[in-house]
Amino acid sequence: MHILDKVDAAQLRDDIPEFRAGDTVDVHLKVIEGSKSRVQVFRGVVIKRQGSGIRETFTVRKVSFGIGVERTIPVHSPNIDKLEVLSRGKVRRAKLYYLRDRHGKAAKIKEKR
């Protein structure tokens, strides 16, 4: 297993800021369409973070035109151009699945002071 750990450690990113469930983030993702490449921003609330090492992922949720959109992204993905933490959320849970059933003001997360 030591060889696999070394391979994983070589691919880990160190430019990812510290964030957790409840935080509002901007994820700048590289999108390749044909031969062109561009950066697409996905802004939303982190509803879960799971795994460890190279397999670690997080899920970001936003409401776009009245429809909830969730995207699961590997933390150490080379497709992440930049990850910005916009605000820290005040939550008591590690997994915020209950936000899926809430709409409007009920889905709002209080900001840490």
Curated annotation (Swiss-Prot):
It holds the Pfam family Ribosomal_L19. One of its GO terms (molecular function) is structural constituent of ribosome. GO terms for cellular component: cytosolic large ribosomal subunit. Keywords: Ribonucleoprotein, Ribosomal protein. GO terms for biological process: translation. InterPro entries: Ribosomal_bL19 (IPR001857), Ribosomal_bL19_CS (IPR018257), Ribosomal_bL19_sf (IPR038657), Translation_prot_SH3-like_sf (IPR008991). It comes from the Bacteria. This protein is located at the 30S-50S ribosomal subunit interface and may play a role in the structure and function of the aminoacyl-tRNA binding site. Belongs to the bacterial ribosomal protein bL19 family. PANTHER family: LARGE RIBOSOMAL SUBUNIT PROTEIN BL19M, RIBOSOMAL PROTEIN L19. This is Large ribosomal subunit protein bL19.
